[in-house]
Protein backbone atom coordinates (compact mmCIF):
# COMPACT_ATOMS: atom_id res chain seq x y z
CA UNK A 1 0.00 0.00 0.00
CA UNK A 2 1.31 3.46 -0.92
CA UNK A 3 2.42 5.67 1.95
CA UNK A 4 0.75 9.02 2.68
CA UNK A 5 3.47 11.60 2.06
CA UNK A 6 3.89 14.84 3.99
CA UNK A 7 5.63 17.54 1.94
CA UNK A 8 7.28 20.82 2.79
CA UNK A 9 7.16 22.95 -0.36
CA UNK A 10 9.41 26.01 -0.26
CA UNK A 11 8.68 28.74 -2.81
CA UNK A 12 12.06 30.41 -2.55
CA UNK A 13 11.91 34.21 -2.21
CA UNK A 14 8.09 34.47 -2.08
CA UNK A 15 6.62 36.69 0.66
CA UNK A 16 3.52 38.66 1.66
CA UNK A 17 3.41 42.37 0.90
CA UNK A 18 0.35 44.62 0.74
CA UNK A 19 1.38 46.97 -2.07
CA UNK A 20 1.04 45.71 -5.64
CA UNK A 21 3.77 48.03 -6.94
CA UNK A 22 6.70 45.93 -8.18
CA UNK A 23 5.15 42.95 -6.40
CA UNK A 24 5.42 39.91 -8.69
CA UNK A 25 3.73 37.71 -6.07
CA UNK A 26 0.57 39.84 -6.20
CA UNK A 27 0.66 40.52 -9.93
CA UNK A 28 1.22 36.93 -11.05
CA UNK A 29 -1.70 34.76 -12.11
CA UNK A 30 -1.40 31.86 -9.66
CA UNK A 31 -4.70 29.96 -9.58
CA UNK A 32 -3.29 26.94 -7.75
CA UNK A 33 -1.68 28.84 -4.89
CA UNK A 34 -4.85 30.94 -4.57
CA UNK A 35 -7.05 27.82 -4.57
CA UNK A 36 -5.10 26.25 -1.70
CA UNK A 37 -4.89 29.58 0.11
CA UNK A 38 -8.67 30.00 0.01
CA UNK A 39 -9.49 26.40 0.89
CA UNK A 40 -7.03 25.50 3.67
CA UNK A 41 -5.81 27.01 6.96
CA UNK A 42 -3.23 29.78 6.48
CA UNK A 43 -0.99 32.04 8.51
CA UNK A 44 2.18 34.06 7.99
CA UNK A 45 5.51 33.73 9.75
CA UNK A 46 8.67 35.80 10.18
CA UNK A 47 11.72 34.93 8.08
CA UNK A 48 14.19 37.70 8.93
CA UNK A 49 16.06 39.41 11.75
CA UNK A 50 16.03 38.10 15.30
CA UNK A 51 13.44 35.44 14.40
CA UNK A 52 16.07 33.58 12.37
CA UNK A 53 19.15 34.40 14.45
CA UNK A 54 20.20 37.46 12.44
CA UNK A 55 20.65 41.02 13.70
CA UNK A 56 17.42 43.00 14.07
CA UNK A 57 16.03 44.19 10.75
CA UNK A 58 18.45 42.05 8.72
CA UNK A 59 16.78 40.41 5.74
CA UNK A 60 16.73 36.63 5.66
CA UNK A 61 18.26 34.50 2.92
CA UNK A 62 18.08 30.95 1.63
CA UNK A 63 20.96 29.57 3.67
CA UNK A 64 19.67 31.02 6.94
CA UNK A 65 16.08 30.16 6.07
CA UNK A 66 16.70 26.49 5.34
CA UNK A 67 18.95 26.14 8.39
CA UNK A 68 16.18 27.50 10.65
CA UNK A 69 13.49 25.44 8.92
CA UNK A 70 15.42 22.20 9.25
CA UNK A 71 16.54 22.82 12.83
CA UNK A 72 13.08 23.72 14.07
CA UNK A 73 14.53 26.43 16.29
CA UNK A 74 16.28 29.81 16.02
CA UNK A 75 19.79 29.19 14.70
CA UNK A 76 22.21 31.97 15.55
CA UNK A 77 23.86 32.83 12.27
CA UNK A 78 27.51 33.47 11.51
CA UNK A 79 26.84 37.20 11.09
CA UNK A 80 25.40 37.44 14.61
CA UNK A 81 28.19 35.31 16.08
CA UNK A 82 30.94 37.35 14.43
CA UNK A 83 29.36 40.70 15.37
CA UNK A 84 29.13 39.52 18.97
CA UNK A 85 32.77 38.38 19.01
CA UNK A 86 33.89 41.81 17.75
CA UNK A 87 31.76 43.58 20.38
CA UNK A 88 33.06 41.29 23.16
CA UNK A 89 36.67 41.63 22.03
CA UNK A 90 37.01 37.84 21.57
CA UNK A 91 37.62 38.46 17.87
CA UNK A 92 40.96 40.12 18.60
CA UNK A 93 42.05 37.15 20.75
CA UNK A 94 41.06 34.56 18.11
CA UNK A 95 43.89 32.02 17.72
CA UNK A 96 43.45 31.50 13.98
CA UNK A 97 43.45 35.23 13.24
CA UNK A 98 46.49 35.79 15.43
CA UNK A 99 48.32 32.85 13.83
CA UNK A 100 47.49 34.26 10.39
CA UNK A 101 49.02 37.59 11.34
CA UNK A 102 52.03 35.98 13.08
CA UNK A 103 52.73 34.26 9.74
CA UNK A 104 52.92 37.67 8.04
CA UNK A 105 55.23 39.09 10.68
CA UNK A 106 57.56 36.07 10.74
CA UNK A 107 57.86 36.03 6.94
CA UNK A 108 58.02 39.82 6.57
CA UNK A 109 55.26 39.32 4.00
CA UNK A 110 51.86 40.77 3.16
CA UNK A 111 48.34 40.29 4.51
CA UNK A 112 45.69 40.00 1.79
CA UNK A 113 42.05 40.36 2.77
CA UNK A 114 39.38 38.95 0.43
CA UNK A 115 35.68 39.59 0.80
CA UNK A 116 32.41 41.02 -0.44
CA UNK A 117 32.55 44.75 0.29
CA UNK A 118 29.03 45.62 1.46
CA UNK A 119 26.72 45.58 4.45
CA UNK A 120 24.28 43.19 2.75
CA UNK A 121 24.90 40.72 5.56
CA UNK A 122 24.09 37.73 3.36
CA UNK A 123 27.65 36.66 2.50
CA UNK A 124 29.70 39.14 4.50
CA UNK A 125 29.73 42.47 6.29
CA UNK A 126 32.35 45.11 5.59
CA UNK A 127 32.56 46.02 9.29
CA UNK A 128 34.28 42.63 9.70
CA UNK A 129 36.94 43.90 7.28
CA UNK A 130 37.36 46.97 9.51
CA UNK A 131 37.88 44.71 12.54
CA UNK A 132 40.56 42.79 10.61
CA UNK A 133 42.29 46.07 9.74
CA UNK A 134 42.24 47.07 13.43
CA UNK A 135 43.73 43.71 14.40
CA UNK A 136 46.48 44.05 11.77
CA UNK A 137 47.27 47.54 13.04
CA UNK A 138 47.52 46.27 16.66
CA UNK A 139 49.88 43.52 15.56
CA UNK A 140 52.13 45.88 13.62
CA UNK A 141 51.45 44.56 10.11
CA UNK A 142 52.63 47.04 7.50
CA UNK A 143 51.55 45.57 4.17
CA UNK A 144 47.79 45.05 4.07
CA UNK A 145 46.05 44.64 0.71
CA UNK A 146 42.29 44.48 0.31
CA UNK A 147 40.85 42.58 -2.66
CA UNK A 148 37.31 43.89 -2.79
CA UNK A 149 34.43 42.01 -4.37
CA UNK A 150 31.56 44.32 -5.29
CA UNK A 151 28.01 43.37 -4.42
CA UNK A 152 25.14 45.13 -6.22
CA UNK A 153 22.84 42.23 -5.46
CA UNK A 154 22.18 42.11 -1.72
CA UNK A 155 22.49 45.92 -1.70
CA UNK A 156 21.75 48.61 -4.31
CA UNK A 157 23.11 47.88 -7.77
CA UNK A 158 25.39 50.91 -7.73
CA UNK A 159 26.44 51.39 -4.11
CA UNK A 160 30.11 50.35 -4.30
CA UNK A 161 31.56 53.86 -4.12
CA UNK A 162 30.04 54.41 -0.68
CA UNK A 163 31.75 51.28 0.69
CA UNK A 164 35.01 52.12 -1.07
CA UNK A 165 35.05 55.64 0.40
CA UNK A 166 34.29 54.37 3.92
CA UNK A 167 37.01 51.74 3.64
CA UNK A 168 39.54 54.29 2.39
CA UNK A 169 38.62 56.50 5.36
CA UNK A 170 39.40 53.51 7.61
CA UNK A 171 42.77 53.01 5.85
CA UNK A 172 43.59 56.67 6.54
CA UNK A 173 42.42 56.53 10.15
CA UNK A 174 44.56 53.46 10.92
CA UNK A 175 47.49 54.35 8.67
CA UNK A 176 47.46 50.88 7.05
CA UNK A 177 45.70 49.17 4.18
CA UNK A 178 45.02 49.86 0.52
CA UNK A 179 42.93 48.39 -2.28
CA UNK A 180 44.88 45.97 -4.46
CA UNK A 181 42.18 44.64 -6.76
CA UNK A 182 38.45 45.00 -7.35
CA UNK A 183 36.09 42.43 -8.91
CA UNK A 184 32.35 42.22 -9.37
CA UNK A 185 30.91 39.24 -7.47
CA UNK A 186 29.78 37.77 -10.81
CA UNK A 187 33.47 36.92 -11.33
CA UNK A 188 34.94 36.43 -7.86
CA UNK A 189 31.96 34.66 -6.29
CA UNK A 190 30.63 32.25 -8.90
CA UNK A 191 29.32 28.93 -7.58
CA UNK A 192 28.58 27.01 -10.78
CA UNK A 193 32.14 26.13 -11.86
CA UNK A 194 32.28 28.88 -14.46
CA UNK A 195 36.05 28.98 -14.14
CA UNK A 196 36.46 31.48 -16.96
CA UNK A 197 34.85 34.07 -14.63
CA UNK A 198 36.92 33.12 -11.58
CA UNK A 199 40.09 33.21 -13.66
CA UNK A 200 39.57 36.92 -14.36
CA UNK A 201 39.27 37.63 -10.61
CA UNK A 202 42.27 35.38 -9.87
CA UNK A 203 44.42 37.23 -12.42
CA UNK A 204 43.57 40.59 -10.84
CA UNK A 205 44.30 39.26 -7.33
CA UNK A 206 47.63 37.72 -8.38
CA UNK A 207 48.51 40.96 -10.23
CA UNK A 208 48.89 39.06 -13.47
CA UNK A 209 46.81 40.23 -16.36
CA UNK A 210 43.92 42.63 -15.75
CA UNK A 211 42.99 46.24 -16.50
CA UNK A 212 44.72 48.70 -14.14
CA UNK A 213 43.42 51.93 -12.62
CA UNK A 214 45.01 54.51 -10.36
CA UNK A 215 42.31 54.11 -7.70
CA UNK A 216 39.43 51.78 -6.89
CA UNK A 217 37.02 54.67 -7.39
CA UNK A 218 38.37 55.41 -10.86
CA UNK A 219 37.93 51.77 -11.91
CA UNK A 220 34.37 51.59 -10.64
CA UNK A 221 33.41 54.87 -12.31
CA UNK A 222 34.88 53.61 -15.61
CA UNK A 223 32.75 50.47 -15.24
CA UNK A 224 29.64 52.57 -14.63
CA UNK A 225 30.43 54.53 -17.79
CA UNK A 226 30.40 51.21 -19.66
CA UNK A 227 26.90 50.51 -18.33
CA UNK A 228 27.97 47.91 -15.75
CA UNK A 229 26.55 47.66 -12.23
CA UNK A 230 28.62 46.60 -9.20
CA UNK A 231 27.95 42.87 -9.55
CA UNK A 232 29.35 42.80 -13.09
CA UNK A 233 32.43 45.04 -12.73
CA UNK A 234 35.22 43.32 -14.67
CA UNK A 235 38.12 42.52 -12.29
CA UNK A 236 40.84 45.20 -12.27
CA UNK A 237 44.08 45.95 -10.47
CA UNK A 238 44.57 49.09 -8.38
CA UNK A 239 48.01 50.65 -8.89
CA UNK A 240 50.20 50.38 -5.76
CA UNK A 241 53.33 48.65 -4.46
CA UNK A 242 51.44 45.35 -4.24
CA UNK A 243 52.57 42.67 -6.65
CA UNK A 244 49.78 40.20 -5.91
CA UNK A 245 49.55 37.23 -3.57
CA UNK A 246 53.06 35.77 -3.24
CA UNK A 247 54.99 33.02 -1.46
CA UNK A 248 54.87 33.39 2.32
CA UNK A 249 51.84 35.73 2.32
CA UNK A 250 48.63 35.35 4.32
CA UNK A 251 45.08 35.49 2.97
CA UNK A 252 42.05 36.01 5.21
CA UNK A 253 38.70 35.59 3.41
CA UNK A 254 36.02 37.25 5.54
CA UNK A 255 32.92 35.96 3.74
CA UNK A 256 31.04 33.81 6.24
CA UNK A 257 28.66 32.16 3.78
CA UNK A 258 30.45 29.26 2.09
CA UNK A 259 28.70 28.67 -1.21
CA UNK A 260 30.05 31.66 -3.14
CA UNK A 261 33.46 31.78 -1.44
CA UNK A 262 34.45 28.16 -2.06
CA UNK A 263 35.54 28.29 -5.70
CA UNK A 264 38.01 31.15 -5.35
CA UNK A 265 39.39 29.50 -2.22
CA UNK A 266 39.92 26.23 -4.08
CA UNK A 267 42.07 28.06 -6.63
CA UNK A 268 44.39 29.24 -3.84
CA UNK A 269 44.13 26.45 -1.27
CA UNK A 270 43.33 23.18 -3.03
CA UNK A 271 46.47 21.51 -4.36
CA UNK A 272 44.35 19.28 -6.62
CA UNK A 273 42.62 22.23 -8.29
CA UNK A 274 42.04 21.56 -12.01
CA UNK A 275 39.63 24.32 -13.14
CA UNK A 276 42.39 26.10 -15.07
CA UNK A 277 46.19 26.26 -14.94
CA UNK A 278 47.40 28.03 -11.80
CA UNK A 279 50.78 28.85 -10.37
CA UNK A 280 50.58 27.62 -6.76
CA UNK A 281 51.59 30.07 -4.02
CA UNK A 282 54.13 28.44 -1.69
CA UNK A 283 53.93 28.71 2.11
CA UNK A 284 50.61 30.56 1.92
CA UNK A 285 48.63 30.86 5.18
CA UNK A 286 45.01 30.71 4.04
CA UNK A 287 42.27 31.46 6.58
CA UNK A 288 38.51 31.59 6.05
CA UNK A 289 35.90 32.93 8.46
CA UNK A 290 33.89 29.69 8.23
CA UNK A 291 34.48 26.28 6.63
CA UNK A 292 33.74 26.53 2.91
CA UNK A 293 34.24 22.89 1.88
CA UNK A 294 36.41 19.81 2.49
CA UNK A 295 38.70 20.41 -0.51
CA UNK A 296 40.09 23.67 0.83
CA UNK A 297 43.18 23.57 3.03
CA UNK A 298 42.31 26.52 5.25
CA UNK A 299 42.44 27.54 8.89
CA UNK A 300 38.87 28.20 10.09
CA UNK A 301 38.30 31.34 12.16
CA UNK A 302 34.79 30.45 13.38
CA UNK A 303 34.22 26.70 13.61
CA UNK A 304 30.73 25.38 12.92
CA UNK A 305 28.35 24.82 15.83
CA UNK A 306 26.85 21.34 15.50
CA UNK A 307 23.07 21.10 15.20
CA UNK A 308 21.47 17.88 16.41
CA UNK A 309 17.93 16.63 15.92
CA UNK A 310 17.19 18.40 12.67
CA UNK A 311 14.09 17.30 10.73
CA UNK A 312 16.15 14.80 8.70
CA UNK A 313 17.71 13.18 11.75
CA UNK A 314 14.34 12.85 13.48
CA UNK A 315 12.88 11.26 10.35
CA UNK A 316 15.77 8.78 10.33
CA UNK A 317 15.34 7.99 14.03
CA UNK A 318 11.67 7.22 13.38
CA UNK A 319 12.43 4.97 10.38
CA UNK A 320 10.78 7.38 7.95
CA UNK A 321 11.80 7.70 4.32
CA UNK A 322 12.58 11.17 3.02
CA UNK A 323 13.28 12.87 -0.29
CA UNK A 324 15.20 16.13 -0.81
CA UNK A 325 14.62 17.64 -4.25
CA UNK A 326 15.60 20.93 -5.94
CA UNK A 327 17.45 22.29 -8.94
CA UNK A 328 21.16 23.13 -8.74
CA UNK A 329 20.75 26.68 -7.40
CA UNK A 330 18.90 25.51 -4.28
CA UNK A 331 20.14 21.94 -3.95
CA UNK A 332 22.63 22.74 -1.15
CA UNK A 333 19.77 24.41 0.71
CA UNK A 334 17.43 21.39 0.79
CA UNK A 335 20.35 19.09 1.67
CA UNK A 336 23.31 20.62 3.53
CA UNK A 337 21.56 23.60 5.13
CA UNK A 338 18.28 21.79 5.83
CA UNK A 339 20.37 19.14 7.62
CA UNK A 340 22.09 21.72 9.83
CA UNK A 341 25.36 21.81 7.90
CA UNK A 342 25.64 18.08 7.21
CA UNK A 343 26.47 16.72 3.76
CA UNK A 344 25.86 13.01 4.36
CA UNK A 345 22.45 11.54 3.65
CA UNK A 346 20.45 10.18 6.57
CA UNK A 347 19.33 6.56 6.56
CA UNK A 348 16.15 6.39 4.48
CA UNK A 349 16.96 9.64 2.66
CA UNK A 350 17.32 9.99 -1.07
CA UNK A 351 18.03 13.05 -3.16
CA UNK A 352 17.17 14.35 -6.62
CA UNK A 353 19.27 17.10 -8.12
CA UNK A 354 17.88 18.67 -11.29
CA UNK A 355 20.36 20.79 -13.28
CA UNK A 356 19.63 24.51 -13.42
CA UNK A 357 19.66 25.89 -16.97
CA UNK A 358 22.97 27.30 -18.20
CA UNK A 359 22.00 30.88 -18.97
CA UNK A 360 23.81 34.13 -18.15
CA UNK A 361 20.95 35.37 -15.95
CA UNK A 362 17.70 33.63 -15.09
CA UNK A 363 15.41 36.40 -16.37
CA UNK A 364 16.28 34.89 -19.78
CA UNK A 365 14.60 31.63 -18.72
CA UNK A 366 12.18 32.43 -15.87
CA UNK A 367 10.77 28.89 -15.68
CA UNK A 368 14.33 27.66 -14.94
CA UNK A 369 14.03 23.89 -14.29
CA UNK A 370 10.72 23.99 -12.40
CA UNK A 371 8.94 21.64 -14.83
CA UNK A 372 11.78 19.12 -14.63
CA UNK A 373 11.76 19.30 -10.82
CA UNK A 374 8.00 18.73 -10.85
CA UNK A 375 8.30 15.74 -13.21
CA UNK A 376 11.05 14.18 -11.09
CA UNK A 377 8.96 14.58 -7.95
CA UNK A 378 5.87 13.03 -9.54
CA UNK A 379 8.06 10.10 -10.58
CA UNK A 380 9.25 9.72 -6.96
CA UNK A 381 5.70 10.01 -5.59
CA UNK A 382 4.56 7.24 -7.91
CA UNK A 383 6.91 4.84 -6.12
CA UNK A 384 4.57 5.20 -3.14
CA UNK A 385 7.33 4.81 -0.52
CA UNK A 386 7.85 8.35 0.79
CA UNK A 387 6.98 9.68 4.25
CA UNK A 388 8.59 13.12 4.06
CA UNK A 389 9.42 15.36 1.09
CA UNK A 390 11.39 18.59 1.16
CA UNK A 391 11.06 20.45 -2.13
CA UNK A 392 12.34 23.84 -3.23
CA UNK A 393 11.26 25.87 -6.26
CA UNK A 394 14.10 28.35 -6.90
CA UNK A 395 12.42 30.65 -9.42
CA UNK A 396 10.85 33.49 -7.38
CA UNK A 397 14.21 34.13 -5.72
CA UNK A 398 16.64 33.56 -8.58
CA UNK A 399 14.60 35.49 -11.15
CA UNK A 400 13.64 38.09 -8.52
CA UNK A 401 17.35 38.89 -8.20
CA UNK A 402 17.25 40.30 -11.73
CA UNK A 403 15.10 43.19 -10.51
CA UNK A 404 12.92 42.67 -13.59
CA UNK A 405 9.19 42.52 -12.98
CA UNK A 406 7.88 40.68 -16.06
CA UNK A 407 10.31 37.73 -15.91
CA UNK A 408 9.68 37.41 -12.15
CA UNK A 409 5.92 37.26 -12.76
CA UNK A 410 6.54 34.55 -15.37
CA UNK A 411 8.73 32.68 -12.89
CA UNK A 412 5.94 32.60 -10.31
CA UNK A 413 3.36 31.54 -12.88
CA UNK A 414 5.56 28.61 -13.95
CA UNK A 415 6.01 27.56 -10.33
CA UNK A 416 2.27 27.81 -9.70
CA UNK A 417 1.58 25.45 -12.57
CA UNK A 418 4.00 22.92 -11.09
CA UNK A 419 2.68 23.48 -7.56
CA UNK A 420 -0.81 22.50 -8.68
CA UNK A 421 0.30 19.16 -10.10
CA UNK A 422 2.47 18.29 -7.12
CA UNK A 423 0.02 19.24 -4.37
CA UNK A 424 -2.96 17.63 -6.10
CA UNK A 425 -0.97 14.41 -6.41
CA UNK A 426 -0.07 14.50 -2.70
CA UNK A 427 -3.71 15.14 -1.77
CA UNK A 428 -4.78 12.23 -4.00
CA UNK A 429 -2.47 10.03 -1.91
CA UNK A 430 -4.15 11.28 1.31
CA UNK A 431 -0.99 13.16 2.17
CA UNK A 432 -0.42 16.71 3.42
CA UNK A 433 1.54 19.68 2.12
CA UNK A 434 2.88 22.76 3.86
CA UNK A 435 3.34 25.50 1.24
CA UNK A 436 5.62 28.28 2.43
CA UNK A 437 8.81 30.24 1.69
CA UNK A 438 12.22 30.90 3.21
CA UNK A 439 12.41 34.71 2.77
CA UNK A 440 11.08 37.52 0.61
CA UNK A 441 12.35 38.78 -2.75
CA UNK A 442 9.84 38.52 -5.60
CA UNK A 443 7.32 40.46 -3.49
CA UNK A 444 9.33 43.59 -4.34
CA UNK A 445 11.47 43.71 -7.47
CA UNK A 446 11.03 47.44 -8.12
CA UNK A 447 11.67 50.36 -5.78
CA UNK A 448 9.00 53.04 -5.30
CA UNK A 449 10.56 55.03 -8.15
CA UNK A 450 10.64 51.99 -10.48
CA UNK A 451 14.32 51.17 -10.18
CA UNK A 452 15.25 47.45 -10.14
CA UNK A 453 15.35 46.09 -6.58
CA UNK A 454 17.51 42.98 -6.53
CA UNK A 455 17.70 42.40 -2.78
CA UNK A 456 15.67 40.19 -0.47
CA UNK A 457 12.91 41.72 1.66
CA UNK A 458 12.07 41.39 5.36
CA UNK A 459 8.40 40.67 4.69
CA UNK A 460 6.70 37.71 6.41
CA UNK A 461 6.12 34.56 4.36
CA UNK A 462 2.82 32.73 3.85
CA UNK A 463 2.05 29.28 5.24
CA UNK A 464 -0.69 27.01 3.90
CA UNK A 465 -1.30 23.67 5.63
CA UNK A 466 -3.47 21.44 3.45
CA UNK A 467 -5.31 19.83 6.34
CA UNK A 468 -8.92 20.79 6.80
CA UNK A 469 -10.40 21.27 10.24
CA UNK A 470 -7.29 22.61 11.99
CA UNK A 471 -6.53 26.18 13.08
CA UNK A 472 -3.11 27.78 12.76
CA UNK A 473 -1.45 30.20 15.16
CA UNK A 474 -1.56 33.81 13.99
CA UNK A 475 2.20 34.30 13.98
CA UNK A 476 5.35 32.26 14.10
CA UNK A 477 8.79 31.96 12.56
CA UNK A 478 10.63 29.63 10.17
CA UNK A 479 11.76 27.52 13.13
CA UNK A 480 8.13 26.49 13.66
CA UNK A 481 7.85 24.65 10.34
CA UNK A 482 9.70 21.45 11.34
CA UNK A 483 7.55 21.05 14.48
CA UNK A 484 4.48 21.49 12.24
CA UNK A 485 5.78 18.74 9.92
CA UNK A 486 6.31 16.44 12.92
CA UNK A 487 2.78 17.25 14.06
CA UNK A 488 1.40 16.15 10.66
CA UNK A 489 3.61 13.03 10.74
CA UNK A 490 2.49 12.19 14.31
CA UNK A 491 6.10 12.11 15.44
CA UNK A 492 7.19 13.34 18.86
CA UNK A 493 9.19 16.57 18.92
CA UNK A 494 12.57 16.30 20.74
CA UNK A 495 13.52 18.82 23.43
CA UNK A 496 16.31 20.55 21.51
CA UNK A 497 13.86 21.43 18.73
CA UNK A 498 12.45 24.47 20.49
CA UNK A 499 10.09 25.77 17.77
CA UNK A 500 6.34 25.23 18.16
CA UNK A 501 3.89 23.62 15.77
CA UNK A 502 1.80 26.23 13.95
CA UNK A 503 -1.25 23.99 14.41
CA UNK A 504 -3.26 24.99 17.47
CA UNK A 505 -4.12 22.14 19.85
Swiss-Prot record:
Q: Which GO terms describe its cellular component?
A: cytosol
Q: Which UniProt keywords apply?
A: Glycolysis, Isomerase, Manganese, Metal-binding
* Primary enzyme class: isomerase
An individual GO BP term: glycolytic process
Q: Which cofactor does it need?
A: Mn(2+)
Q: Which GO terms describe its molecular function?
A: manganese ion binding; phosphoglycerate mutase activity
Protein name from the UniProt record:
2,3-bisphosphoglycerate-independent phosphoglycerate mutase
Q: Which organism is it from?
A: Staphylococcus aureus (strain Mu50 / ATCC 700699)
Amino acid sequence: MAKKPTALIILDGFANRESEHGNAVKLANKPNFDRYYNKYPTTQIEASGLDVGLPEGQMGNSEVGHMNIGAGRIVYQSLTRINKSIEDGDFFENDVLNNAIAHVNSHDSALHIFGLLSDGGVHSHYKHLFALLELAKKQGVEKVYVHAFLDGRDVDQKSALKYIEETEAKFNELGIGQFASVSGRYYAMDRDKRWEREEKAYNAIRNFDAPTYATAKEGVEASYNEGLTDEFVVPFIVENQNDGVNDGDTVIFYNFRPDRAAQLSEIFANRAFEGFKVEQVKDLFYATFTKYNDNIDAAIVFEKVDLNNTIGEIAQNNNLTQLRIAETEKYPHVTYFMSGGRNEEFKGERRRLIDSPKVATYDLKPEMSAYEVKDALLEELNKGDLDLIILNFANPDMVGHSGMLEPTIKAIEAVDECLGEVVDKILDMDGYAIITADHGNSDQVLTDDDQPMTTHTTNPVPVIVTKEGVTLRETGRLGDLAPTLLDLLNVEQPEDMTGESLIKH
